[in-house]
């Protein structure tokens, strides 16, 4: 796995997945985010075994694909420190995820992607299409019925 991505892309994706990353995990892998890289995109996936969030970002420069996991919180904190216009170079070096920018070089320990629990995707028998605006309106009209 070897690719470049703009800071804003990876930070946006990491922030979206952090909400589901376990703070007090029973399995160490649940503190990690799954990286899946192909020619044009980076998919980040996080789970707490009840919920799963997956994001897709466009990569700037692809060298090789692959999968790994890395600590979500550490990675997010590190990426936020980089300058806003940074292009971040991610690549695997043995059991480490190497991260390079113009401001420095960093290593994060990884866990095998095979250990990451992924939900089975189910195809819906029936589906509807709804605009985000209509969905937001429907949720706001029923929010009073939710428990605290």
Predicted feature descriptions by range:
Residues 1-148:
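Structural preference for solvent-exposed beta-strand-turn elements
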